Amino acid sequence: MRKLLCAVLLVALFAASASAWTVGTLSRMNATEEEYSDRNPLAYASGAEGLIQSIVLGDGLSGEGKPSFKFYDSLTMMQMALNRGEVDVIITPDFVGEYMLRNNPDCSLRVFVLLKRPITLALGFLEEKAELCKRFNEALKTLTENGMTSHLARYYIAGPEAQNPKPVSIEKFEGAETVNILVTGDIPPLDYVDAGGMPAGYNTALLAEIGRLLHVNINLVSGEAGARAAALKSGRVDAVLWVEVMPEGEAQFDKPEGVVVTMPYYGWNKVFMISMKKK
């Protein structure tokens, strides 16, 4: 496993009362905080129940400390909440957690890795744009079969570009159809916006390849994670990125009714729980 910041895996994440502890996560398109807390997605993590109760809540407790989830509309807001103690821990995909750790040189964060069943990401469209979704799906199929999605993942997520992704040039085609797609920058380096407000990273590079295959103009529209559903339903954008698709049979917290999705374009099976180090 890749070396984590300061070569430390968390031995004791956080001591809290047995009655409640709060977990920060990015807003989902198809769930309220209450619904998310009731389902407790952390229960899907392999062996998580005992591990979380002993590591996060402290040993010798009753085991009734079910987490309460709090949604944040952006990664920045979620990090600020962790810094000021509004939440006990935050959860992120492994690649986001590693990005945060690399960009936290003072080593003030601690992490524990949970194994989950695979979670995948897809592009989401309204049902009335199902034909457009189908075209994007065919492009993704081609890019998967020819190895391009794997190549981009190695370069932008696992490679040196993950530290500070550069903006990607997206080819424009005169007179061609324009497809507006929301980019949030809230799950770097997969979905990333640089300090100057320019989208970059894996998603941008992937969209450039899709635009080239389909001969369409990709227009990137900036917005926060919490704005994805509203932007899609209002028609501000034609598609949103990183719709989180859970394994079959599990609750779909991020896929509202009336939304269709492409085949997966990225996936992972590790979740990072991150807390602040005690002073």
Where are the model-predicted features located?
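Sec/Tat signal peptide C-region and signal peptidase I cleavage site
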Residues: 14-20
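Extracytoplasmic small-molecule ligand-binding "clamshell" domains
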Residues: 21-84, 89, 93, 174-250
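Extended ligand-binding regions for polar small-molecule ligands
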Residues: 28-30, 50-51, 56, 117-163, ...
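Flexible hinge/capping segments at coil-to-helix
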Residues: 32-41, 263, 274-279
